Amino acid sequence: LGARVLIVDSIQTMHSERIESAPGAVSQLRECTAELVRFAKASGTAVLLVGHVTKEGQIAGPRVLEHMVDTVLYFESDTGSRFRVLRSVKNRFGAANEIGVFAMAEQGLREVTNPSAIFLSRHAKPVSGSVITVMREGTRSLLIEVQVLADLSLGGNPRRVAVGIDANRLTMLLAVAHRHAGLLLGGQDVFANVVGGVRLAETAGDLAIVLAARSSLQDVPLPNSLIAFGELGLAGEIRPVPFGEERLREAAKHGFKLALVPEANVPKRPPQGMTVRGVTRLNQALDAF
């Protein structure tokens, strides 16, 4: 073909005469993908295979397609949002879990060079139940806003609703906060949300979630200049998280002046203009404000 890039949309519609089955069958997927892989290796052409996905967002059909290719990328979007996230879940030649953020404009998709700007909302005045944390996506540090609303439950069983946060982990964090910090949320409906539609999959956001819950319960805003990260253990200890210095540098770059982090994540030289407080216990973190 003489082309540098070949895009096949979609691989489920491809058909090989060597296989007596309908397009989309497992045998057809395996044979067509193998033929395209051989072509890519022999010609040096970059081949992009577009695959169907299920309602759950996974590649449709058996995982044979994922096993045969070098890289698997998911193109994700939320209904009504102009932003799209390109996420790598497999990469034989580099780091997985990398993301690229794009915005849909009149001219088509355009790269968002500063993803933290779309996930982060800076309130003009501090509001209760809102805390900024720093999550890692591949090699990127992203600032995101965690919001928690605690409201008096009018039913017999208080609700626990989590959007962008694992619901089981939210329940566990509230139990730890009650046991080790005396946070009385048993009669409260608790709603937790990550702003911007992003999913907080790592434990580094634990401390921010509990701080936001206490802030909402007492209706006491935390400083606008604060960021917090750290994993919370069942014994009420604040455990260190990977890439602490990188997280702090990203926060300082966006103008945050105060950080509440695990003691083990306190750097010898904090970023210029930032005060970093280290904590080892949950009650120590809550007493800081």
Annotate each predicted stretch with a short phrase.
Residues L1-V5, I11-F289:
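Peripheral, non-AAA+ core regions of ATP-driven protein-machinery
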